[in-house]
Amino acid sequence: YTRDIENGKGERLLSYRQLYSLWLLFPRLGEYMFETFVFIENKHQYGYWGDVKKMCSYVVSKTNNSNHYIIDYIVNLTNFYLKKDYDKLKKQENVTLLSKWIPREKSKYKWLFKKLAKNMYSKYLFTADNSNNLLSARKKCYTNYRKLISTLNRYIDTPQIKMAEKNWRYIKPEKVTAITMMKNKEAFLNRKKDGTKLVERYVLEERKECANNFKKYFNTTSKIKGKTLNTYELVREAFRYCNDKEMQEVINKQWADNSEKNFDIGNTIAMVDTSGSMESDNSVPLYNAIGLGIRISEKTTTLFKDRILTFDNQPKWWKFDENMTFCEKCYYLRRAPWGMNTNFYLAMEFILDVIVQNNIPPEEASNFTMIILSDMQIDASINDIRGNFKSKFNTMMDNIKDLYKKAGLES
């Protein structure tokens, strides 16, 4: 669940930490778990093939040993599936995206590339009888491995191959993955920022034709791949392109595709913490809270549909117009006050007011689920807005229970 990019949290580093600890205690179980990160037969894997280099890098950071047995297992597993892909290529069958994520020889993971290459073509190393021949054998391993990866990448029509070869006009927009689209959409549209304005990046016809292909695709398709993107990434992109209608349309369609993996969640209230502490870590906590809050408001039932409660030192209800796009919802929430406090107790009083004003009976109110999207740096509470005294010796939960109990008795 922690690593699952479709139905779980999609956490990377936390998953690597958990798996590493598990692997040390139960090696066979660790092997099985990692394989499910990268491949599951007839089903979407929990992670992606990029986990190969990421997990190996994590093991090195913990052990300072690039020859650790966990890394050796991952290398063997990777080349096993690479061989299977090559066999499928010769039969013109579908292959995985593994070759796209193999570390490159000139990248920061070049040590892993070399390890993979020598593992795949170890027969060349066994025949070397002196240091010069061994050096030549290693180079032969690297060369053959590069060719193998290149052959597979051409077969799966990887956009990066066409980008590197300057064959931009032949990139097929519908073949571009969600992550590649997010990272390279400016390049695909042949644009760059010049101060506050967007200008043409290159005058080459090759790039202009690519831009026209993507514009046509964006305008004619109802959705753009976005299922594997994190909600915070989409919120971040929405804020980044707040003055760019063309990019907003792309982000809105990716959000629509991303939302298809979620279902209706019943009587659920989204409570979004907009206090200053949420802006740590490049605002990732805040962007996650906004994105998840919007998603919950879209999937909840009638009473709280299109509504979000933000809370810092002063909670506030935000009601979305039913015709608002995802980007417009992000900009609307941007107007929420970004205070330095988190008054959770007052937020709970706001929810109680809605329940009382709508004459919702206690038995129905008890079925509500409140999802709190916060780093939980919450203020202490002594008095409420009704002037009622709350014991400072009680926990906040006790005070909230007393508040709702009193309202239930008066209903």
List each model region and its residues.
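Long lumenal/extracellular ectodomains of secretory and single-pass membrane proteins
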Residues: Y1-N288, E298-S411
